[in-house]
């Protein structure tokens, strides 16, 4: 059954993505074991929904048919893709069979190819994505592959997102040519743009968004939507705003219950950035990033004690074990 007749919005992919990432970042083995059957069930549900083109069928999306989403949309498939990757990492930590985890990894690889072949598209002159088969108008959710680390069409997608067709003073339009905006896609897009390495463009639009939302005439939080709900505040959007910094600028991706990858992106006009008192991976730690000539100096401190101190080239990824 589906909530209020909203049809299948891709909930299975949403839950698997969120629960797997949460369990990794939380760092609690017992909690991870408790969540595993839910994650496993949702992954199997999505697998059974795969079309002949290898993407996930769903007859709606999180906008619940306010805008067309076709029979299979980009959002659901990219969420399922990242869920498979996170589940393979999480399962290793809690004793799931290697065969099952290898299957998840193989399914993720196949899905990445299917996303490119089914959704990859020249749309309104941009080398980007169509949201569903038959879609020929730019949609804000073309940002989703960037958020999940798929950069095959990054440049064309970023150009499309910040073109006058989609970007307004209130962030991204849900669909080009309309007046409707939902902050969630703008917040995902800013995160994905910075994570993809387009730091200066991402920061420029992040500043514009922050001035408008956090310091403007409807403050102090990110909003849900307009015109629906008259820009009401919901907590989820504020959480997504924070993730622009943690996953975009600091490039943190959980890869275990005690470890993560980090690809810091220090904006040119900043000399340093610090993220202190991070409670994740069952630990308490700080991350300090500063510029040293052409390189970035990265230091991670756990309970005040330095555990990593190294210089890296911009755009490089380092692994941290707490």
Labelled PLM ranges:
Residues 24, 44-47:
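HEAT/HEAT-like alpha-solenoid repeats
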Residues 1, 12, 33, 37-44, ...:
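Active-site core of glycosidic bond-cleaving carbohydrate-active enzymes
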Residues 60-65:
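A short, charged helix-loop
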Residues 97, 103-106, 110, 118, ...:
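Beta-rich accessory regions
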Residues 2-6, 23-33, 66-71:
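The substrate-binding groove and active-site-proximal loops of carbohydrate-active enzymes
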Residues 21-22, 87:
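Alpha-helical transmembrane segments of multipass membrane proteins
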Residues 238-268, 276-277, 286, 319:
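Terminal, non-catalytic domain-edge segments
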